[in-house]
Amino acid sequence: MSLQAAGTETQPHDLAARTVAVIAEHGSIEGPLLPILHAIQQEFGFVPRASLPIIAGALNISNAEAHGVATFYHDYRSAPAGRHVLKLCQAEACQSMGSDKVAAMVKQALGIGFHETAKDGSVTLEPVYCLGLCACAPSAMLDGEVIGRVDAEAIEEIVAEVRR
C-alpha cells in the first residue's frame, strides 16, 4: 500500500518516519498541533489520514481530537491538491459584487466544482470566506497571489494560467 502525494509515492513506513521527524521539529513549542499539521501538509502536500494517530500519540491527545482539528480547518487537505490552487471568495462583500457568477463561470470553464481537482491534476478549486480584499470584490487567490475585481477577462487569464 502506498500514498500518492504531490507526484511522489510515499510508503507507510516512510510516512511514519517523516511524520515523526516533523513532530520532532515542532513538538517542543507550546500548542504544537496546528504548526505540526501545517508542516505535515507542507511535507506531503496534504495531511495523510495515517499521520493523525502518530501525531495524536506524540502529543498525548485522542485520535478524534487530531482528526477533528485536521478536518475543521479548511486549509488542511485530506488529499493532494492540483498543481495550482484557486480559491474564490464567497464572503458577503464578494457575493454582493457577483462572486456567485464568477464561481459559476470558473466551475464551467474548469469542469470542476468546489473541493474538486481537475482530472489532469492541473488545479484544485476551493471556496474561501474572505481574502481581506473587500474593496476590490469579487476576489480570488491563485497559488497564494490575491486577485481583485475578478471578471470574465480575469477568469480567462486564470484558466489559461492553470492549464499551462
Identify the residue ranges that each predicted region occupies.
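Signature of N-terminal electron-transfer/Fe-S-associated modules in redox systems
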Residues: M1-R164
